[in-house]
Amino acid sequence: MRLLFINETHPDSRHVAGMRLNRFATALIERGHEVVQVTGPAPGHPSGTGTTHDVAPKLISLAAPVTREEKSAVMRRVKTALRLTRSDRATDEWLNLARGQTLGALGDFRPQLIWATFGNVYSLLLARRLAREWACPWIIDAKDNWESFNRRGLRAIVARRFASAAGLTANSRLHREIAKRYFPGSAVELVYSGVAEPFYRARRAGHQDQSGTRTLLLVGGTYRRAILDQYLGAIADWLQTLSATDQARFRLRYAGADHDVVTDAAAAKGLLAVADITPAIPLDALADLVRTSFCATYLWSPHTFHHKLLELLVAGQAVVAFPGEHAESVEFAAQCDTPFAVARDRASLIEQLSLLWAAAPQSATRRAAPRWRWGDFADGLEAFFEAILSSKHSAGDKQRHEVER
């Protein structure tokens, strides 16, 4: 297959949004398919073309859309709502420039199918425009919760705007069922994101920290400040149950996009002296942190699927979710031998930390890791693309009769 992937976040960024399409592109190239990826500018670099790895899609890096920053929060919400539901002059100008740059960089390459991530409308607008010109099907990657990215009252309107998509993909059963509400009759395929090799290497190595320090790792987003405060409050209370010697060995580590929020919350709980808080770090460094921690934790939101759990489970050290988790995630945890628990309140979290502090770290001699690599999950994605291409309803008619908005 000849495939064009469109995602506004460059794969060299340290954000999870830049990984999914790029990793699947590499997996499909290894299967013999041709894949080109259109993306946003590389961090600190202008737009252009290139590749980032030996086996990787050709990258077409577009300039970011130019939008005027509104000082008023109300006006920012209004502008965002308008941008989701209809094009404005700035959007049209960007779309024309992006189309021209993409066509110029593609040369003679003509995709049979386009796959675009929904994080904002720009990727979908470009995918729809190119699909119409080439009379090929395009697919929306609704990897996240459709309702989280669209305000109430706009969700169905935005879905109708992009109804010409031949189908959708979703990163969890939770997100798939939500997408089905707004795209009735459309095929919505479940395609989990994969786990990168550094986490498998961490599992094979086992716990090897000889420093004497024992690290509690917090990963991912913090979502609600109230939940973060409960989590850190439980840690502060638990620390008081340890001996002075054990307290001196303890470190709390966070590396992620919410580092400012975590720093402020940790200060409020008197934990800054035992905390190391930084922005996001590369995956191999994160995997090493998981390997050398006595426990990895994350904060649960009922509105999303936490793909980070799969990475933590593969790495092999104990994992605790706070203050809940979906059945879908618990089922993943049951597929491997990594210790996993859901702490639903302060007392439960303190109990889990006490048990894990007293337990021996996980060794490298254990059951084989689950098959959750990007290449493993590419099986379903490849089959879905092939089914869309073979469907009589996927191409042409929907594109030609749609009025562009």
Language-model segments: which ranges?
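Acidic donor-binding loop of glycosyltransferase active sites
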Residues: 288-304, 317
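Carbohydrate-associated surface elements
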Residues: 174, 194
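A charged, aromatic-enriched C-terminal amphipathic alpha-helix characteristic of glycosyltransferases
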Residues: 344-351, 357-389
